[in-house]
Structures are given as C-alpha cells and as structure tokens.
C-alpha cells in the first residue's frame, strides 16, 4: 500500500488542505505567515517556510483570535477523524471535544481532576492558601479526548462480571456516579512564539 493511502497520511493531508482553504494559514502582502510572531525574526522565517511548504496562497492576515479558534477547530476535526479508528487498540465510548473559555466543560469535569474544583473553592475562601499555591494547578487544554462511563449492562455483556457487591468505587462504572475519564488533552497554540516549544503534526 502506498504510504499516502494510510489513514493518518490521508487525514494529515486533508488537515493541511483545510488550513489553507479556510485561510487559517496564509501569507500576507508583507510575506508574514498568519501563524508567525511578527516581532520575532526566527518565528517569521519558520512560519513562512511552513506556509510555503504547504503552498499557502498570499492573503491578508486574519484576526489572531479568529485564526486561533479556527486552528483549534481543524485540529479537533483531525483528532475526531483519526482517533476513533483505533477502537481495536483503545476500545471505549470516546468523545473528542473542543473547549473554550465559555465552555461549560472544564478540566474539573473529569474524574482525574474533579478535586481541582474543590481546590478552587478553598483558595477563593482562604487568601493565605491562594497566595501559597496560586492558580498554576489549573489545567486548561484546548481539546480533550475523554471516555464516557460504562453501564453495568455493557460491562456484563459477555458474562456476569460486576454486581452491587464489587467495584463500587471503579471510575469506569456509570452506576457509581463518577465523572467521565480524561484520556488526552491537546494544547493548540497557533502563533509560533519564541517562548513556546513548537510541535507539528
């Protein structure tokens, strides 16, 4: 099978095409790519090189927040179109969601981080505690992949595995009233700033 016919290669190509089609990635009349930090020579050079490699057309720069939101949406689409195809490796009822500042879903919505909501309330009520630990513990990813909980019917689908006498604290079991389980979080930063590490898909 040719290397460009495998799922990840095809979806990566589509992802790059969508960056161009939506104008998220473009080069303006001054030769500055939309994901460049215009005040950083290195950022401008790297961003332009990437844009040219992906054959970006010359367009005026879109607003930073608009480009950032578009990048997050396109990145979420890429994850949605690829991760579920790994069901045979990671079985489960998965959700891929783009979070935003206005989203009702926060990191504390998930089982592993539900204690953060409690910690936030404590620091609001106690100035000394707030000064001591600050708010650096808050995790704010742009995109999350999480697993929904399983009903007892799903768990017992092939044979009786659980009942009311066992697994009463298992996070995966819906009957226990827990929260969804966070599997992955993605930070999608559009602008190539010199103080941020760079990763590419």
Spans of model-derived segments:
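Short acidic, S/G/P-rich loop/turn micro-motifs used as interaction or catalytic elements
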Residues: 150-152, 189-195
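Conserved catalytic cores of phosphodiester-cleaving nucleases, focusing on short active-site segments
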Residues: 143, 182-188
């Amino acid at each position: 099978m040719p290397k460009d016919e495998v799922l990840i290669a095809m979806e990566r190509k589509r992802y790059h095409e969508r960056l161009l089609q939506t104008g998220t990635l473009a080069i303006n009349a001054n030769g500055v790519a939309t994901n460049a930090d215009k005040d950083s020579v290195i950022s401008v050079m790297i961003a332009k090189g990437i844009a040219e490699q992906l054959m970006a057309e010359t367009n005026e720069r879109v607003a930073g927040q608009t480009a950032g939101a578009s990048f997050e949406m396109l990145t979420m689409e890429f994850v949605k179109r690829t991760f579920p195809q790994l069901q045979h490796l990671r079985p489960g009822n998965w959700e891929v969601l783009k979070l935003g500042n206005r989203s009702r879903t926060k990191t504390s919505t998930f089982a592993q981080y539900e204690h953060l909501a409690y910690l936030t309330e404590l620091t609001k009520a106690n100035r000394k505690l707030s000064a001591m630990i600050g708010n650096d513990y808050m995790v704010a990813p742009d995109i999350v992949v999480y697993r929904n909980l399983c009903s007892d019917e799903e768990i017992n689908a092939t044979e009786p595995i659980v009942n009311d006498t066992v697994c009463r604290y298992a996070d995966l079991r819906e009957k226990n009233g827990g929260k969804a389980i966070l599997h992955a979080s993605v930070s999608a930063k559009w602008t190539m700033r010199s103080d941020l590490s760079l990763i590419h898909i």
